């Protein structure tokens, strides 16, 4: 799509050189054929370093745009990006008249399974009844897909993975832009989900696709039932994520992190290797590895327990007055 066509679609003024835009991408990863955006002061430091062909940016930051990057000036780059994401969204279901599928002869596929176009299914894979396998999905050798699992387009699943009943892999993330009237506009997610080898995903768990790039669950990680993992998360090797945990978008867990039941992160943060978050712990900042944390606001678990004891003693003393 031509940059002039994008400007017209967004009702923006553009009189520069017309160029072809192939896709949308993040500020630092966009290349010379892609369009990106910058919204707010937090990311302005990255504008001079973008390699994008074009950028949606507010007037006040136009001077930071590199000379080889075309600027589309907008009052709300995030909202303009949301509108544009729909224009670049991939089709949910292939319109190909004949599907191309590479399914190993040893794979076992039970009744009422939908398999999309350009799907690769490895040796000794088992796909149980009612599963949905979208376009461009790959499933590694000896993986087991339980009943009614949904695997959306472009998902990559490694070897010997277990996906338990009713889990959903690769659905759109929870991302919206807002106008001045408080109305919400969907951001279409064009990334994917990657599950590396030996990953287990529990029943009724959901893992959202990335806006760009991939949501990644690394090798050996085990995810319990009823867990939510948001878009663009990066979960390290051999993590344990217990039921009803919520991991917000762009959270990064190191290797062998344990998230206790009903714990959560607030997103865009890092938890170091070999950390443990106790049940119901609320993580709202980066955490050093190798320690046990708990409570909210998050702190060392031993300090949280001491605090609870002090509160209980103080309450008891006051009740006796």
Curated annotation (Swiss-Prot):
The keyword Secreted does not apply. It holds the Pfam family Hexapep. GO terms for cellular component: membrane. It catalyses: a UDP-3-O-[(3R)-3-hydroxyacyl]-alpha-D-glucosamine + a (3R)-hydroxyacyl-[ACP] = a UDP-2-N,3-O-bis[(3R)-3-hydroxyacyl]-alpha-D-glucosamine + holo-[ACP] + H(+). InterPro entries: Hexapep (IPR001451), Hexapep_transf_CS (IPR018357), LpxD (IPR007691), Trimer_LpxA-like_sf (IPR011004), UDP_GlcNAc_AcTrfase_non-rep (IPR020573). Pathway: Bacterial outer membrane biogenesis; LPS lipid A biosynthesis. It comes from the Bacteria. GO terms for molecular function: N-acyltransferase activity. Keywords: Acyltransferase, Lipid A biosynthesis, Lipid biosynthesis, Lipid metabolism, Repeat, Transferase. It is an enzyme of class 2 (transferase). SUPFAM superfamilies: Trimeric LpxA-like enzymes. GO terms for biological process: lipid A biosynthetic process. The active site is at residue 231. Its EC number is 2.3.1.191. HAMAP family: LpxD (MF_00523). Belongs to the transferase hexapeptide repeat family. LpxD subfamily. Catalyzes the N-acylation of UDP-3-O-acylglucosamine using 3-hydroxyacyl-ACP as the acyl donor. Is involved in the biosynthesis of lipid A, a phosphorylated glycolipid that anchors the lipopolysaccharide to the outer membrane of the cell. Homotrimer. This is UDP-3-O-acylglucosamine N-acyltransferase. It comes from Campylobacter jejuni subsp. jejuni serotype O:2 (strain ATCC 700819 / NCTC 11168).
């Amino acid at each position: 799509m031509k940059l002039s066509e994008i400007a017209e679609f967004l009702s923006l003024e553009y009189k520069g050189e017309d160029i072809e835009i192939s896709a949308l991408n993040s500020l630092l990863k966009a290349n010379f054929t892609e369009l990106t955006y910058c919204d707010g002061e937090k990311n302005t430091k990255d504008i001079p370093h973008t390699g994008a062909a074009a950028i949606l940016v507010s007037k006040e930051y136009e001077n930071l745009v590199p000379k080889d990057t075309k600027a589309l000036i907008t009052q709300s780059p995030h909202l303009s990006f949301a509108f544009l994401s729909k224009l670049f969204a991939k089709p949910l279901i292939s319109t190909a008249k004949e599907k191309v599928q590479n399914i190993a002869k040893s794979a076992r596929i039970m009744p009422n399974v939908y398999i999309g176009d350009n799907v690769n299914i490895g040796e000794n894979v088992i796909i149980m009844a009612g599963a949905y396998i979208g376009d461009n999905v790959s499933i590694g050798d000896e993986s087991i897909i339980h009943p009614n699992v949904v695997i959306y387009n472009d998902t990559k699943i490694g070897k010997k993975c277990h996906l338990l009943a009713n889990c959903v892999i690769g659905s759109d993330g929870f991302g919206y832009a807002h106008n001045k009237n408080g109305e919400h506009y969907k951001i279409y997610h064009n990334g994917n989900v990657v599950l590396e080898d030996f990953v287990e995903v529990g029943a009724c768990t959901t893992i959202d696709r990335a806006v760009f790039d991939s949501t990644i669950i690394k090798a050996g990680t085990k995810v319990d039932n009823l867990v939510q993992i948001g878009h663009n998360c990066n979960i390290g090797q051999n993590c344990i994520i217990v039921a009803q945990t919520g991991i917000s978008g762009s959270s990064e867990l190191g290797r062998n992190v344990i998230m206790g039941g009903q714990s959560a992160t607030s997103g865009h943060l890092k938890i170091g290797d070999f950390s443990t978050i106790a049940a119901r712990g609320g993580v709202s900042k980066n955490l050093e590895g190798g320690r046990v944390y708990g409570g909210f606001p998050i702190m060392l678990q031993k300090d949280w327990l001491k605090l609870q004891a002090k509160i209980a003693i103080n309450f008891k003393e006051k009740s006796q007055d």
